[in-house]
């Protein structure tokens, strides 16, 4: 279920300030953040944001296609190792 349209998109204030500061100076550097819940805005395009996945910061390069999505969508938290079970090939 999505967010109400009357509320608008959400982005943490500290992250938005960092992006605006980099846009003013024209610098490109990696921004570390724990804010997986923040929506990607058009101002973010071209920046690399290191999103925390619970273990480490995953670098995510922001493109135009990502606008409107959440940062957490691009940094998976769990790695699927496969289902546990009998390995029938090794028993033969």
Curated annotation (Swiss-Prot):
Lineage: superkingdom: Bacteria
Would you name any one GO CC term?
A: cytoplasm
Q: What family is reported?
A: Belongs to the universal ribosomal protein uS19 family.
Gene3D superfamilies named in the record: 30s Ribosomal Protein S19, Chain A
| Biological process, per Gene Ontology | ribosomal small subunit assembly; translation
- The record lists the organism as Geobacillus stearothermophilus
Q: Does the keyword Zinc-finger apply?
A: no
The protein's name in its UniProt record: Small ribosomal subunit protein uS19
- Source organism phylogeny: Bacteria, Bacillati, Bacillota, Bacilli, Bacillales
Matching entries from PANTHER family are given as:
RIBOSOMAL PROTEIN S19P FAMILY MEMBER, SMALL RIBOSOMAL SUBUNIT PROTEIN US19M
> What GO molecular function terms would the record report?
rRNA binding; structural constituent of ribosome
The family database entries (HAMAP family) matched by this protein are listed as: Ribosomal_uS19
Q: What does the UniProt record say this protein does?
A: Protein S19 forms a complex with S13 that binds strongly to the 16S ribosomal RNA.
Keywords in alphabetical order = Ribonucleoprotein, Ribosomal protein, RNA-binding, rRNA-binding
- So what does mutating residue 13 to G actually do? In strain: 10
InterPro entries to which the protein is assigned, alphabetical:
Ribosomal_uS19, Ribosomal_uS19_bac-type, Ribosomal_uS19_CS, Ribosomal_uS19_SF
Quote any Pfam family the record assigns.
Answer: Ribosomal_S19
* UniProt keyword RNA-binding, yes or no: yes
